[in-house]
Amino acid sequence: MTTQLEQAWELAKQRFAAVGIDVEEALRQLDRLPVSMHCWQGDDVSGFENSEGSLTGGIQATGNYPGKARNASELRADLEQAMRLIPGPKRLNLHAIYLESDTPVSRDQIKPEHFKNWVEWAKANQLGLDFNPSCFSHPLSADGFTLSHADDSIRQFWIDHCKASRRVSAYFGEQLGTPSVMNIWIPDGMKDITVDRLAPRQRLLAALDEVISEKLNPAHHIDAVESKLFGIGAESYTVGSNEFYMGYATSRQTALCLDAGHFHPTEVISDKISAAMLYVPQLLLHVSRPVRWDSDHVVLLDDETQAIASEIVRHDLFDRVHIGLDFFDASINRIAAWVIGTRNMKKALLRALLEPTAELRKLEAAGDYTARLALLEEQKSLPWQAVWEMYCQRHDTPAGSEWLESVRAYEKEILSRRG
């Protein structure tokens, strides 16, 4: 530890102690909050099923930065490089299309064995795994419908895919000793004016009930469902709306997924957390950055990211909220994208843990809104960066932008050689 860092750390401890904050306790709490990194940033949501296939489902990864991962080995190597530069506990979030098999596997036939390499890798790297059925980029999703499809056979295919995915998820949890959160998102919807909005939702309701009918150990597997406002090609009607999934998660007591980009541009999920927690047992968060639509830009340390973190910490939701990331930017170095976004999420959590929440609550309850605003703003100037740098030091990761040198070296030595 450098003398400069030691001095900054000691000063930070004193400054935060003056407002009633124990920085050591804050760092201990931060180590209780893993962030689930999404594998699909590494290859632009391509997966390993069909290298020539295109991304569908009303989502887009824009850009053509060189060096994207082309197979599981490259993707795991890239993830390891990113994770070395991110302090503290992490998880990995996988989609079903990232299976590994020597022969083609139909999505309704995926099995735990197709993900055993991921599990062994997770064990070696002390990671938990999360999972998602992939209800997009497939011939049977080409018309824009999956679990709500009017064709019984197509709908059953997707039901069977989700049921098979739940078994994979439970396998993750059993093998790794930490529950896998499996999130169901479907792209189902219509481009233009929709006459019958009820029937697809009735079919989706019945399909989801069949999907979750098999009882699985909650210590191994957690079901989550995710809404969306619209997607490309589904601008006028989305079957799985916020109201649909809020009702479903409440009535079935599944987890509810809130994606930062899946609502109207003037809505924020930070305001939805406390409301949803009154009705659902657990929340899954997909922290993202929507720019005018669900563009999935890299997460910044901005007001909304901070507000999300603050909601988790202020209400002590550590055991009820699962923090995941969801962005995919193909216009910049993909490893850097992971590092920037994940470090920013962790910085926001740390800043929330360094807030004198008890004092702010007292001021609010007393109606002293002047002091509340003053303290909230003064808090931003306290030396949280020194605490962050100590956290990085203790986890043997770069504290500042030094991590970028490692990414550039990896790009030169590894990524530049990929076709």
Curated annotation (Swiss-Prot):
Record keyword Flavoprotein present: no
Cofactor: binding details: Binds 1 Mn(2+) ion per subunit.
EC annotation from Swiss-Prot or TrEMBL: 5.3.1.14
InterPro entries for the chain: L-rhamnose_isomerase (IPR050337), Rhamnose_isomerase (IPR009308), Xyl_isomerase-like_sf (IPR036237)
EC class (word): isomerase
One GO BP: rhamnose catabolic process
Keyword Cytoplasm: yes
Subcellular location: Cytoplasm
Pathway(s) per entry: Carbohydrate degradation; L-rhamnose degradation; glycerone phosphate from L-rhamnose: step 1/3
Binding residues for Mn(2+): 262, 294, 296
NCBIfam families named among the record's database cross-references: PRK01076.1 (NF002203), rhaA (TIGR01748)
Protein name per the record: L-rhamnose isomerase
